[in-house]
Design a protein with these regions (language model features):
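Short cysteine-rich clusters marking metal-coordination/redox-active sites
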Residues: 64-67, 133, 345-348, 370-373
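C-terminal segment of N-terminal export signals and the immediately downstream linker at the start
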Residues: 4, 25-70
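N-terminal pre-triad scaffold of radical SAM enzymes
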Residues: 61-73, 107-134
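Conserved AdoMet/S-adenosylmethionine-binding subsite of the radical SAM
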Residues: 153-313, 318-321
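Short, non-ligating residues that shape and space the ligands of small metal-coordination modules
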Residues: 73, 142-143, 354-355, 379-380
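Cys/His-rich metal-chelating microdomains
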Residues: 70, 74, 84-87, 132, ...
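Short linker/helix segments within small regulatory modules
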Residues: 75, 358-366
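N-terminal secretory signal peptides and thylakoid transit peptides that target proteins
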Residues: 1-21
Length: 384
């Protein structure tokens, strides 16, 4: 068995300048003594990087052009995400090379089911988010500012070298909304181009077109949360809106970025099967039948602790609706050992990938094709 990575040996291998994440839930890779921890971390370290995504206004005001919130920000103030600041009429990212969470995950945890099965994803996040989802699972860092978290100093070059050192095939921007640290993502992606590493993100898709086009230049795959299918749900449950997310999905398709969709089903909020059907019809029409769709089980957390977990039967009914609408790769997520977590050939129905938790067995797939009937299966099955 491979020895697990601890915080101490990670820091030792990656360089003494790294610091450590405040949230143990995102870095459960071992323990470290208090004295070592105090030497390893730095609270509130802010990595300034001028952003190209803003428009100057009068009186040193600026308008952010990164996401549809279009924040107008005065001098020494920050945008809604809390990680971008107007410094004398220029807009700066405060989280460049400054992640507060670093972990090596199975790629299926993102979740990506059609990208290098059983591969290792070097995963990272900074503080901040441009949504305030009432059901957020990582709210301790997504709703924090970089002043409040314990952070690494981890340059894009160090990200690449660390990912390779730990035999990762993928670098994943995840846990919070990676759009808020886009400058960091872009640089990591550019360095990764010359290495045998895929670059992926798990995003809410709430981003303007030009920044998204820039990301498409460096992304291999994107997992997008389609959190609901009404503007009312987005407004009341996330603080965002639906239309920009749908536009993001269409742009990703046009740019041929492999995309998977996650729909977290919250009881009484977005689990109406008629709306699920409308969503699946839109996906089929606009994105095609082969896009993987994950119906994920909700568990009580953050501001929705009084709502019970999603009944498994609800997820199963949603999966039936999606398949009835012609979607070919529909999954039940957050339900360990559920048969809806396996991948089947849509032509001959043979099982191609068996998933029991994070134990993955590729048993009927060869070079991206079903071994039984030869049907091409959408996805990324080889690294660069």
């Amino acid at each position: 068995m491979q020895r697990p990575i601890t915080r101490r040996n990670f820091l030792g291998r990656c360089g003494r300048s790294l610091s450590i994440c405040a949230s143990s839930t995102l870095f459960p890779l071992g323990t470290v003594s208090r004295s070592a921890r105090s030497a390893a971390i730095e609270k509130g370290f802010i990595g300034h990087k001028r952003s190209p995504y803003f428009k100057p206004l009068d009186n040193q005001m600026i308008r952010c052009t990164l996401c549809p919130h279009a924040c107008e920000v005065g001098p020494s103030e920050r945008g809604l995400c809390g990680v971008r600041e107007n410094i004398k009429g220029q807009y700066y990212s405060l989280v460049y090379a400054n992640p507060c969470a670093v972990q090596i995950d199975p790629i299926e945890k993102k979740p990506f089911y059609h990208v290098l099965p059983a591969s290792r994803a070097f995963s990272l996040a900074t503080a901040g988010c441009n949504f305030d989802c009432k059901f957020c699972q990582n709210w301790e860092i997504s709703q924090a500012q970089p002043d409040d978290t314990y952070n690494y100093r981890l340059s894009p070059e160090q990200v690449i070298s660390s990912a390779l050192q730990y035999k990762s095939e993928v670098i994943a921007s995840t846990y919070v909304e990676p759009v808020t640290f886009i400058e960091y993502m872009l640089e990591i992606g550019r360095f990764a181009k010359s290495q045998p590493l895929l670059k992926v993100m798990h995003s809410n898709g709430f981003i303007n077109e030009q920044p998204l086009e820039d990301l498409c230049d460096v992304l291999d795959a994107a997992c997008i949360d389609l959190k609901g299918f009404t503007e009312d749900f987005y407004r009341t449950m996330t603080g965002g809106s639906l239309a920009p997310v749908l536009n993001t999905l269409k742009i990703l398709k046009s740019r041929q970025v492999h995309t998977e969709i996650v729909n977290l089903m919250v009881p009484g909020k977005n689990d109406d099967l008629q709306k699920v059907r409308a969503m699946c019809q839109w996906i089929h029409t606009e994105l095609g039948p082969d896009i993987p769709l994950h119906f994920s089980r909700f568990y009580p957390r953050y501001k929705l602790k009084s709502i019970p977990p999603t009944p498994v039967s609800t997820l199963e009914k949603a999966r039936e609706v999606a398949e009835d609408e012609g979607l070919r790769f529909v999954y039940v997520g957050n339900v360990p050992e559920h048969p809806g977590g396996h991948t089947y050939c849509p032509h001959c129905e043979k099982m191609l990938i068996r998933r029991i938790g994070y134990r993955i067995k590729v048993q009927g797939l060869n070079d991206g094709k079903c071994q039984n009937c030869g049907r091409v299966i959408a996805g990324i099955w080889k690294s660069h």
